[in-house]
Amino acid sequence: MRQLLLLLCILLPHLLPARTIYVVSVGIAKYQYINNLRQTENDATDMAALYRTHTTHVTLLTGKNATRQSICTTLKNVFAQAEADDVVVFFFSGHGSKGGLCAYDTRGASTCISYGEIAKIIKGCRANNKLLFIDACYAGGLRHDSNAAVSAQSSFDKTEGVMLFLSSRTNETSRENPYGRNGQFTRYLLRGLKGGATITATALWRRRNSSTLWLSTWPRLPRASSTL
């Protein structure tokens, strides 16, 4: 039942006026210290635009504004406003490492935003419905952080109402789409989210996944995971 409610919040937020949606959308194309990307800021901008048609609580961080401190502080402050019946959404498109997500000012693995930190922020939020869309290399690490010191913090138990949409497994890299405005993962994610009320979580993932496989020869299968 909670899964159905959560999908309605994703696809039909205008039908649930009593529920407030809080969104933090992050995209980084030009990094301070590591190699640049092309479409990631477009990804975050388009995801923010999609949710702005349904809520005023959308924060967009791109480029040099998406520092480590800024991302963590924004997630904490924005999601702290949510009540139990609300929905929080975190979208990230950029570089990822096996230890976490790379902010604008990330220099190496020790300065990334660890999966444990992200999970701690999400788990501390009062909202019962939490969505994470991660378009980055090694995104699967968010499910099970490889760092033993924070693995307990980064795992999501089944009571937390968290749904993860991840572009890669723990040991996989992601690739940008050589054509168009958006990366491959985000392109089909956006298309799926705009697809109408009849789509389910499984159908949404199958639609995006089958399209990706049809358009490319990438030796990987992006992952969807629900702890609902």
Short names for language-model regions:
Residues 2, 7, 16-228:
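Cysteine endopeptidase catalytic domains of the caspase/legumain-like
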Residues 10:
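Active-site glycine/GP-rich loop and adjacent strand/helix microenvironment
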